[in-house]
Amino acid sequence: MKEPTKIDFQHRRISQISDFTELLGMLFPGNRNQRYAAACMFCELKWANGMVPNLAYLEDKYGISRRVLQRARAKLTRLGLIEHVSCLNSRYGGQHGWKLSSRFEAGLRQLAEKCSTSRDKTVGSEEKDKMLLGFVRASLDP
């Protein structure tokens, strides 16, 4: 039976995560090679002094193929767990390279806030919600 490749984002599973390897298992459920590459990147970026200019050295150090490394890096970047800083970014004083990012955390906080406000009956109105429901319904009709 083939394993799914989509992120396994279940509330019960989230409460059971105790370390970054389990987090990466949730983010890369169907590809052990990408999970390993992501774990290597995460560990290297976490314990690096400053930014890592290039992640290509991980290919030789950990025996990871370039394609797997690039795909894992792209997914971690899209999720906001890592980010590339340009040398033109004045915030980092001309430094450039890869670093761990807080965008994922900020996005999850915003999502939690949106879920909380959408449940609150004091925010918005029933008429507006029914109108929005009508828009969703209209998008279903061909």
Feature annotation, model-predicted:
Residues 102-134:
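Short, amphipathic alpha-helical interaction segments positioned at domain boundaries
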Residues 77-89:
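A short, conserved structural fragment
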Residues 67-70:
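Key DNA-contact positions within bacterial/archaeal DNA-binding proteins
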Residues 51-65, 76:
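A short alpha-helical element within helix-turn-helix/winged-helix DNA-binding domains
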Residues 1-53:
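Short recognition helix of helix-turn-helix/winged-helix DNA-binding domains
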Residues 1, 137-142:
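C-terminal regulatory/oligomerization modules of transcriptional regulators
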Residues 73:
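DNA major-groove recognition helix of helix-turn-helix
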